[in-house]
């Protein structure tokens, strides 16, 4: 996958197009990511020990990884991702500016 947990991304298609957020979790086997504040759904929860009231809560749902683009650290604009080897390690870099995305 071209994005990882902690990356700042922008949604490029769907109902939340244009929104930006940080990736909270990545699910590589399903090709989906959980982005903070994006794709909010209402979830009905039964009363339990932790939540005796129960009710309806709003939470993020995963979206397909093809619908997000990482933001370039230099320009703050969405960018495609390239890979190159630096000091024997494969790193991701922003195609827009050439800036390395991996810390």
From Swiss-Prot:
Signal peptide: none annotated. One of its GO terms (cellular component) is ribonucleoprotein complex. Disulfide bonds: none annotated. InterPro entries: KOW (IPR005824), Rib_uL2_dom2 (IPR014722), Ribosomal_uL24 (IPR003256), Ribosomal_uL24_CS (IPR005825), Ribosomal_uL24_KOW (IPR041988), Translation_prot_SH3-like_sf (IPR008991). One of its GO terms (biological process) is translation. Keywords: Ribonucleoprotein, Ribosomal protein, RNA-binding, rRNA-binding. GO terms for molecular function: rRNA binding; structural constituent of ribosome. SUPFAM superfamilies: Translation proteins SH3-like domain. PROSITE patterns: RIBOSOMAL_L24 (PS01108). One of two assembly initiator proteins, it binds directly to the 5'-end of the 23S rRNA, where it nucleates assembly of the 50S subunit. One of the proteins that surrounds the polypeptide exit tunnel on the outside of the subunit. HAMAP family: Ribosomal_uL24_B. Belongs to the universal ribosomal protein uL24 family. Part of the 50S ribosomal subunit. This is Large ribosomal subunit protein uL24. It comes from Anoxybacillus flavithermus (strain DSM 21510 / WK1). The gene is rplX.
């Amino acid at each position: 996958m071209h994005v990882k947990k902690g990356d700042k991304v922008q949604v490029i298609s769907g109902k939340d197009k244009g929104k930006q957020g940080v990736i909270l979790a990545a699910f590589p086997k399903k090709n989906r990511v959980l982005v903070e504040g994006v794709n909010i759904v209402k979830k009905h929860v039964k009363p339990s020990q932790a939540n005796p009231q129960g009710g309806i809560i709003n939470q993020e749902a995963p979206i397909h990884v093809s619908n997000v683009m990482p933001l370039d650290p230099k320009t703050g604009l969405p960018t495609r991702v390239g890979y190159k080897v630096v000091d024997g390690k494969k790193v991701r870099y922003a195609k827009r500016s050439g800036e390395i995305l991996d810390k």
